[in-house]
Design a protein with these regions (language model features):
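Short alpha-helical catalytic segment bearing the HExxH-like zincin motif
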Residues: 56, 60, 513-525
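Catalytic Zn2+-binding segment of zinc metalloproteases
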Residues: 73-74, 522-538
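Catalytic zinc-binding patch centered on the HExxH motif and its immediate surroundings
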Residues: 31-38, 478-512
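Short pre-active-site segment immediately N-terminal to the catalytic Zn-binding motif
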Residues: 502-518, 528-534
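A short, well-structured edge-of-sheet supersecondary motif
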Residues: 20-49, 212-217, 221-225, 484-486
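Active-site-adjacent helix/loop patches that line small-molecule binding or acyl-intermediate pockets
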Residues: 22-24, 80-171
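Active-site SXXK
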Residues: 55-78, 104, 260-264
């Protein structure tokens, strides 16, 4: 009898019991009552009403309340200066740099929000929150600490009525977009706007628990906790949270877009759908028929957002739309709401094109409805288009100019036809975007910035070397030369490869070591999906063979 084998098999059988997964808990405010979900990494294991007695430590959430007070009372900005004196500055900035309010909230810089530094008095604080019927723990400045335990229900109550929450929601999208949280934006899109938190799960302060709390894009409060830090909770459970969290279909950005419908086609007459009498200029409500000067016609629906105007004797249709409704209508006109991943990518491209090309008149963006810009449906967006748009609300792909086309695929141009093929192959929306726009980065509307500081000389060197290496590398099992990629400057840490975005991060491009790093990371990308792509010894040996030959 092979006793070693029997012991090994018994260990495998008992292993799941010994290392049983602690379920993730998700509290979500509902229309009738709050619900508590228990989730494993594979799905929902239990759903029940949220107990009034369930508690949570505040952890880093106290900073969100200080942020809300600062914003709502219009306190002047007081940047925190990092001097290298405190280990807590690792969450804030490098020595010699400073950090402002919005960034401090995203990075969870407690030193910035310290009430003593900001000269927040306990009396002023208490009066402010008591006037807003806040929970007792929130109105007491001395108890606003990470270790303070509060009921989850009272936490959701406070989030539902939190002052300045629209501003907080806008800023907290950056938490999901943090590149260190790999795969989170890919799985969740922009649907959650949350402040992360971590604290200790035991009195000995040896076991960590973490999670996040905040809102869905429609303002629904939520709270999450699980074992580990907030970062591990987000990355580990992003996939199952994607399946559980609802996608709102009535979401507004608060920003208006003025669109001249049918801008390139002269209008002859507009009538009610079942009438031959021309309607008079003014706000339109109902179903209408447009007859063009060339004899063609089309019907459309208006619920008061479209106005018939006359300018210099010519008819003109002007629609006043919310930005997200505009994106959804363009999706209906230029593409479709399926397959979902292709549609999500398209909404990001549409929104980015709008930001890069629209003009401004007062508080509104202005853009014509034309094939030279973006074509937009004259009727309200379909439910499917609104869902895809809500899934990516506020997301743009910042960097180089963005274009798209029904069938043509070139660098800098997303092909809808190719995007549908990529979606069918299992690629997610951010991978489709990275293929079309390799030098751009997923970002938010209010802060369009590319996280890739391009190293064009490094990319040009690699592009020149790839044909020279091809003969040798094609003999290696698993080699698949990437079609597109970007080479980016590494701000800190060690060189690495972002396989999803097809990006190679290196420190610089001056020395032999830089070329070794670039080649090494390129090979990780070229062997992605094959075991050798994860074998550091194999990759390093091959790197030196390529550069030393």
């Amino acid at each position: 009898v092979n006793w070693r084998r029997i012991v090994w098999l018994l260990a495998l059988v008992t292993l799941p019991t010994l290392a049983e997964e602690t379920p993730l808990q998700l509290a979500l405010r509902g229309a009738q009552h709050d619900q508590l979900y228990q989730l494993s990494s594979s799905g929902v294991t239990k759903v029940s009403a949220l107990p009034d007695t369930l508690t949570t430590p505040l952890g880093s959430l106290w900073k969100l309340y200080v942020y809300a007070w600062l914003e709502d009372t219009h306190q002047p900005e007081q940047p925190y200066q990092c001097r290298g004196n405190s280990p807590e500055e690792v969450y804030c900035c490098q020595a010699g740099e400073s950090i402002t309010r919005d960034t401090a909230l995203v990075r969870s810089c407690g030193l910035y929000f310290a009430p003593q530094r900001l000269h927040i008095g306990a009396d002023v604080w208490g009066q402010y929150w008591q006037q807003r019927q806040a929970p007792a723990w929130l109105a007491s400045l001395p108890t606003l600490k990470p270790e303070t335990s509060v009921t989850v229900k009272s936490l959701l109550d406070s989030l539902a009525t939190l002052p300045a929450q629209n501003k907080a929601q806008e800023i907290l999208l950056d938490v999901v977009l943090d590149e260190a949280k790999i795969g989170v934006a890919s799985m969740l899109g922009s649907r959650v706007r949350v402040k992360t938190w971590s604290w200790f799960a035991d009195d000995e302060q040896e076991i960590r628990q973490g999670g996040f709390a905040g809102w869905l894009t429609d303002g629904t409060p939520l709270w999450v906790t699980g074992s580990g830090t907030s970062k591990t909770v987000l990355t580990r459970y992003a996939t199952v949270l994607n399946r559980v969290l609802p996608v709102p279909t009535q979401v507004a950005s608060g920003q208006c877009v003025e669109v001249e419908l049918f801008a390139r086609y002269p209008l002859k007459k507009i009538t009610a759908e079942k009438s031959t009498t021309a309607v008079k200029p003014g706000v339109l409500n109902g179903r209408y028929r447009v007859t063009f000067a060339n004899g063609n016609h089309i019907t459309f629906v208006s619920h008061g957002e479209t106005t018939l105007l006359t300018e210099k004797g010519k008819l003109k249709l002007q629609s006043h739309l919310d930005r997200e409704e505009y994106v959804a209508r363009v999706l209906d006109r230029e593409a479709k709401s399926t397959p979902p991943e292709a549609a999500k990518a398209m909404t990001v491209a549409i929104r980015t094109f709008l930001q890069q090309n629209a003009n401004r008149e007062g508080d509104c963006l202005t853009i014509p409805d034309s094939s030279a810009m973006q074509r937009v449906s004259a009727s309200p967006a379909t439910t499917g288009a609104r869902m895809m748009t809500a899934w990516t609300q506020d997301l743009i792909y910042a960097g180089d100019p963005v274009h798209y086309h029904g069938s043509r695929a070139t660098e800098g141009t997303l092909s809808w036809r190719q995007a549908t093929v990529q979606a069918g192959q299992g690629e997610r929306y951010d991978q489709i975007l990275a293929f079309a726009y390799p030098d751009n980065s997923l970002s938010r509307w209010g802060a369009p910035r590319s996280t890739c500081q391009l190293l064009p000389k490094a990319k040009a060197w690699l592009a020149k070397k790839m044909p020279q290496w091809r003969g040798m590398l094609q003999g290696e099992t698993g080699y698949n030369e990437p079609d597109v990629f970007a080479v980016c400057r590494l701000v800190s840490g060690f060189p690495y490869t972002d396989r999803q975005q097809k990006r190679l991060f290196i420190r610089n491009f001056f020395t032999l070591q830089d070329r070794l790093d670039l080649t090494h990371e390129y090979l990780h990308l070229a062997f992605d999906g094959y075991p050798t792509g994860l074998d550091e010894n194999y990759i390093e040996t091959l790197t030196r063979q390529l550069l030393m030959d």
